């Protein structure tokens, strides 16, 4: 809008006077820019920009500030964690100031995204924090530039690795009596065992013994849950090592006894005598193996009876190994007294199947972090292993064919097949030589004897070194990542349950803040979707004639609508999901809010009126608006 001074100057120019001065035009342009400017105070850092800049990304939180009267707001959470909007007063000219209690450093990147259209991720900010800030400001994470995408994804990759990696202290996180994670695990186990199986409740009298199930499960599954659990873990480790040692000693000649067995067969009037030799193991080794199997059986039965989820227990690979390693011993003991041919055949098969006992070595993964890290590394590096196998297969096929034809070059004319002077009779035999050469083993059982074959052998060795060297660094990086995560998680201090104070009630005198007690001049915040769905929350105020101050009072309907979500406590599964996903919202209150300018007045009837059109006792200044 052009001022009266410039209008008179313009009219004077038509009648022959001087044109409007440059100073006047600059003042008018400055006034127009001032009315378009907006000041955003984030965490105490003031940012100044134009409303047109904020409108470049419609549907976001800052776009709502640029057009507070627009009705096209998306149905999304408008509260956010720890957010509030307030008028800062001296916005300068016609501009206004909005305050948000968010991270000021991240907001600089967000505002720069509005200006340039390119969203970059700061390297000095933790990934989950940047993700939360993007969610609060209503920006999609897919808008992150490719140059910063790996930095942004780094935290999520670590979280995914933590999700599939059990805690290094045995699954329970080394939970102490007041450990929050340990309490959640125990609560989850009680829920899976049933409502009356926890030993506390109306039905605890009849099923009180079932209340020991979580404790027994932790005793045999979590070595760090108690001292008794550590003793059980040490005993299990001892029996595993003894069983593996016994298995190895059974194959030594010093522990094998040769026995001559005489068999007499009578068929009618004909009697035949047969002599055969049998090899028996020292009885002491059999007794030791029997004691170990008894321990493993007891451990297996206790764990399957007290497990929270039987289906998960049955599908666990280590539990399958336990069962397969225990079963042959009992079958062998049961069939040892039988003399039939079928029984002897079964016993012979069971003796061959004894090798499954060596699989008990994998049970050590429950007690050693490094073995668990190795297992997760192998699973995470499946693609790299497949790539390595494909490279080796291609190299073996190529060099086996080349060595076969290279060795035929030096064949004598009298040799029609051309393979009398070489070991490479055909291409399939060359496969073995190519594998041994590419893996740099070089047994020496087969080697080229012609100059062309030697050249192919040199190329095969070089190709093998390069082929194996390419995927190995990726596998090593995976192992390093998992190992560092395991060590970091093992050294993390235990999280104790903290006392969370109850939120102030609506009728509490500290719930609403006045201008004398609040450091801000007036209060702003964002419109939340619950407020849009249930209607605009009315702020009723009454004029107190005793002290002349305005007291903010909320209606009962509003109080019920605001306090109801606060009363819902998250379940243990939800708390675990929140910790795994990296969400670290500390404030769960999402309050209904208004974008009011300084000088507006909230009236008793719920309406908002501008300054200058205010009845004396009907409205109160926005500076006394409740800060939710």
Swiss-Prot record:
Glycans are attached at residues 260, 269. K(+) binds at residues 440-443. It is a multi-pass membrane protein. Residues 1-28 are annotated as: Inactivation gate. The chain crosses the membrane at residues 231-251, 282-302, 317-337, 349-368, 385-405, 456-476. Residues 77-88 have a biased composition (Gly residues). Residues 1-230, 303-316, 369-384, 477-628 are cytoplasmic. Zn(2+) binds at residues 120, 126, 147-148. GO terms for biological process: protein homooligomerization; regulation of neurotransmitter secretion. Residues 1-24, 62-88, 493-584 are annotated as: Disordered. It is found in: Membrane. Pfam families: BTB_2, Ion_trans, Shal-type. One of its GO terms (molecular function) is voltage-gated potassium channel activity. Its main location: membrane. It catalyses: K(+)(in) = K(+)(out). The modification Phosphoserine is found at residues 8-9, 15, 21. Keywords: Glycoprotein, Ion channel, Ion transport, Membrane, Metal-binding, Phosphoprotein, Potassium, Potassium channel, Potassium transport, Transmembrane, Transmembrane helix, Transport, Voltage-gated channel, Zinc. Phosphorylation of serine residues in the inactivation gate inhibits rapid channel closure. Residues 531-546 have a biased composition (Basic and acidic residues). A motif (Selectivity filter) lies at residues 440-445. It comes from the Eukaryota. The cytoplasmic N-terminus mediates N-type inactivation. Voltage-gated potassium channel that opens in response to the voltage difference across the membrane, forming a potassium-selective channel through which potassium ions pass in accordance with their electrochemical gradient. The channel displays rapid activation and inactivation kinetics. Belongs to the potassium channel family. C (Shaw) (TC 1.A.1.2) subfamily. Kv3.4/KCNC4 sub-subfamily. Homotetramer. Heterotetramer of potassium channel proteins. This is Voltage-gated potassium channel KCNC4. The gene is Kcnc4.
